[in-house]
């Protein structure tokens, strides 16, 4: 292969592997179940409700991460906004004081994911959108109302069908190695108004085994 051909191949691969700024095709709201998370990592606090891990713009062909590293994260200073975020999007590994003081978790999520939709949502809008979507379903109460309660094991199919009945789309489920429910991803179309089935879900494989909701 000639030098010019190698250069062309390299350029094509670079384009294929590089994220496309602002070209997301769907959005995934990832909610963490703190009880399972805190059995894996040391936590300073363990809420008994689903908390936000992140709001991730993505597309079907290329994983979107760090779309604009030059875009700064400006720390939140409004006390009410910080408390609202900490209630819904806490850094479980940090105390509330450290979390609000340094905002490291929010910064990491914004730089990695929020910059991939900043052509549509600025920093304030991005975090407000995540909180709005999280509050929309009140997932813990909705699961309980649909017969999914803590302390019991359920099939993946049961969980998928129940969450679809609540949200309107099949989720992306993540489990721990002990097959405890760790995260639920809810996917939205590019308008972030309509729930869709999550593309290529992990689904806590193998799907023929039960999943504990601790």
Swiss-Prot record:
Protein origin, superkingdom: Eukaryota
Name a GO molecular-function annotation. Answer: ribonuclease T2 activity
Q: Which GO terms describe its biological process?
A: RNA catabolic process
Cell compartment(s), UniProt: Secreted, Extracellular space
Positions of disulphide bridges: 38-43, 67-116, 175-204, 187-198
List the keywords (alphabetical). Answer: Disulfide bond, Endonuclease, Glycoprotein, Hydrolase, Lyase, Nuclease, Secreted, Signal
Q: Which Pfam families does UniProt cross-reference here? A: Ribonuclease_T2 (PF00445)
Kindly list every residue the record annotates as glycosylated.
49, 59, 160
Signal sequence span is 1-22
| Annotated catalytic residues | 53, 109, 113
Enzyme class name: lyase
- GO CC annotation terms, alphabetical: extracellular region
Q: Where is RNA annotated to bind?
A: 53, 91-92, 94, 105, 112-113
Report the EC code(s) recorded for this entry: 4.6.1.19
Q: Which reaction does it catalyse?
A: a ribonucleotidyl-ribonucleotide-RNA + H2O = a 3'-end 3'-phospho-ribonucleotide-RNA + a 5'-end dephospho-ribonucleoside-RNA + H(+)
Function recorded in the entry? Self-incompatibility (SI) is the inherited ability of a flowering plant to prevent self-fertilization by discriminating between self and non-self pollen during pollination. In many species of the Solanaceae, self-incompatibility is controlled by the single, multiallelic locus S. This stylar glycoprotein is associated with expression of self-incompatibility in potato.
Regarding protein family, the annotation reads: Belongs to the RNase T2 family.
PANTHER family of this UniProt entry?
Answer: RIBONUCLEASE S-2 (PTHR11240:SF81), RIBONUCLEASE T2 (PTHR11240)
Q: What is this protein called?
A: Ribonuclease S-2
From the UniProt record, report the name of the gene that encodes this protein.
S-2
